[in-house]
């Protein structure tokens, strides 16, 4: 897979979130949503049409919104800021998925 900027940002964000302290219930949901972001970016990047790519990019954005909500409840300001930057990149991909 040819790496692209948003995908690289999602991998870095995933690594940076690993030390976040959460309850076991919140941790499970957080991990699933966090992992979904780069996985959907990777899968979407392999799709042949813009419409197909956008579907996966929107799913990644939805997963990031879940993560952002958990960060609002339990997280740190630096992680929230990093999530906002990633969200801006994802939003652009969703609306211009080439």
Predicted regions and their residues:
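Amphipathic alpha-helical assembly/interaction segments
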Residues: 1-98
